Amino acid sequence: MKYVLDTNVLLHDPNAIFSFGENDIVIPLYVFDEVDKFKKELSQRGKSAREVIRKIEALREKGSLLDGVPLGENLGKLYVRYPKHMQ
């Protein structure tokens, strides 16, 4: 199964991408862009945005987010998708 996460989920819990067991996680590109806009804020939302971006960037170093990057042992993969590739 795949779960599509939105901006609110990621900002509420920066570790949300690791919370769905062996299921795959999809983050639409526009959600990643929205999170990126908040990173300069000095608020909790800004702190959460920076944390989300750090986690995704660390995963990106392991492979292509378009092809899916494993999130860890007994976890699914993370995909960042353009809206037309959401399936």
What are these regions (language model features)?
Residues 1-87:
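Active-site-proximal, substrate-binding regions of enzyme catalytic domains
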